[in-house]
């Protein structure tokens, strides 16, 4: 009986270690968190592992932005997008360049105007960030804005 209990304990410990390792790998795949003033953000999503890690982390961030270019035949993710987020008073909350098709930001609750610029074309969106309710905005450039 004692041997059985040791096996069960070992199996439980091993399972917890494997699960923890999986979570650590997902966190390792995230790009580094950066900061502008009091706003933390991360951007990226180049590569399958990083893209999946960002999608998994997205619900835990108040704001998710996604960038793509679409023509008649296909849609491509965008990188090197200049992002400017302004609060309801017109003050810059975030001014950054996204390193990939996703940008996650920890903004306080409120209304924000967002300008996203790629290949000289600027798109505008408005979002409302609410407490415990993540907001998402998707920017899609028509044609081949990725060049």
Give residue spans per PLM region.
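A short tyrosine-centered beta-strand micro-motif
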Residues: 110-116
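Bacterial N-terminal signal peptides
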Residues: 11-20
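Bacterial N-terminal signal peptides that target proteins for export
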Residues: 2-12
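Short amphipathic beta-strand segments in non-cytosolic proteins
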Residues: 82-92
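Short, acidic Ser/Thr/Gly-rich low-complexity loop/linker segments typical of extracellular
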Residues: 91-99
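Short, surface-exposed beta-strand/beta-hairpin micro-motifs centered on an aromatic residue
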Residues: 100-106
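Primarily secretory-pathway and cell-envelope proteins
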Residues: 25-81, 118-147
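Surface-exposed loops/turns
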Residues: 108-109, 131
């Amino acid at each position: 009986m004692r041997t059985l209990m040791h096996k069960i304990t070992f199996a439980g410990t091993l399972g917890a270690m494997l699960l923890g390792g999986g979570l650590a790998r997902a966190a390792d795949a995230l790009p580094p968190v950066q900061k502008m003033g009091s706003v933390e953000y991360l951007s990226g999503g180049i590569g399958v592992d990083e893209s999946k890690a960002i999608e998994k982390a997205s619900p835990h961030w108040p704001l998710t932005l996604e960038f793509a270019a679409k023509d008649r035949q296909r849609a491509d993710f965008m990188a090197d997008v200049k992002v400017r987020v302004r609060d309801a008073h017109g003050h810059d909350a975030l001014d950054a360049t996204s390193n990939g098709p996703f940008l996650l930001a920890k903004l306080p609750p409120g209304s924000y105007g967002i300008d996203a610029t790629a290949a000289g074309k600027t798109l505008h969106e408005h979002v409302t960030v609410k407490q415990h309710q993540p907001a998402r905005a998707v920017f899609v450039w028509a044609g081949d804005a990725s060049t």
